[in-house]
Design a protein with these regions (language model features):
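AAA+ P-loop NTPase nucleotide-binding core of proteostasis motors
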Residues: 1-266
Length: 266
């Protein structure tokens, strides 16, 4: 929950190319490799192409995201060797697929559980180097030697968490824009959501659950039958240590293209 997958999404969006995401927990068995490059002759599914080779053939310029790579079968790593070395992969029909214009990103939580444990020794507040040790244990040297870089993600600071809260509120406001509903988030409310929903061990994922519980659910009834049925402004504030929604109903709200996506509250 520190933004590994989100980085790949934003990279593809910035470059304006397709994002191909594969959840590698679906490829834990040895026979699952045939789903990536296709089944050999005589086996069921031979007439169907491999998921990986077909998608890259359709989108030669793309960001290829292999999520949770440590959960895949070790034989999958062997397939990726020629992709990282020569930029090509041969499917079950002998067709060579070009990977030279593909940005390959692999995410992993290897070493995260060891990193979360308390540090041992004087003057140490957290463990260091556990992630590199876990990567060396899971992946063989020939695989690691073909990687351009190994980037370790640290815990998110509070400044970043506040930006993540704004992002979730922006997404909610975009969903409600066709209903003429605008959301104003005060600074105190953003800090309340950040403190309530962020955990060092769990990352930023609990934030969405806090927003679901304290903002989306209370708004649902007002959107259907209440004050927001014909649009309005929702001001999210805090009162007595709790989140409070101040709803102002309007018959018509003109939304201009120049309006900032997140209105600052007074």
């Amino acid at each position: 929950g520190v933004g590994k997958t989100e980085v790949a999404k934003q990279l593809a969006d910035t470059l304006g190319i397709e994002l191909l995401r594969f959840d590698m927990s679906e490829y834990m068995e040895k026979h699952a490799i045939s789903r990536l490059i296709g089944a050999p002759p005589g086996y069921v599914g031979f007439d169907q192409g491999g998921m990986l080779t077909d998608k890259v053939d359709q989108h030669p310029f793309c960001v290829l995201l292999l999520d949770e790579i440590e959960k895949a079968h070790p034989d999958v790593f062997n397939i990726l060797l020629q992709v990282m070395d020569h930029g090509k992969l041969t499917d079950h029909n002998g067709r060579t697929v070009d990977f030279r214009n593909v940005i390959l990103i692999m995410t992993s939580n290897a070493g995260a559980s060891e990193q979360a444990k308390e540090a041992i020794g004087f003057g140490r507040t957290k463990r260091e180097g556990e992630d590199k040790a876990a990567i060396e244990k899971i992946f063989n040297p020939e695989f690691r030697n073909r990687l351009d870089a190994v980037i370790s993600f640290d815990n998110l600071p509070m400044e970043t968490i506040l930006q993540v809260v704004d992002k979730f509120i922006l997404q909610l406001e975009a969903q409600l824009m066709d209903r003429n509903v605008t959301i104003e988030l005060t600074k105190s409310a953003g800090e309340w959501i950040a403190n309530k929903g962020y955990d060092n061990k769990m990352g930023a994922r609990p934030l969405s659950r806090v927003i679901q519980e304290h903002i989306k659910k209370p708004l649902a009834e007002d959107l259907l039958f209440g004050k927001l049925a014909k649009g309005g402004i929702v001001k999210v504030t805090t009162k007595n240590g709790k989140l409070e929604l101040e709803i102002k109903s309007h018959e018509k709200i003109k939304i201009s293209s120049k309006r900032p996506p997140l209105l600052p509250a007074n």
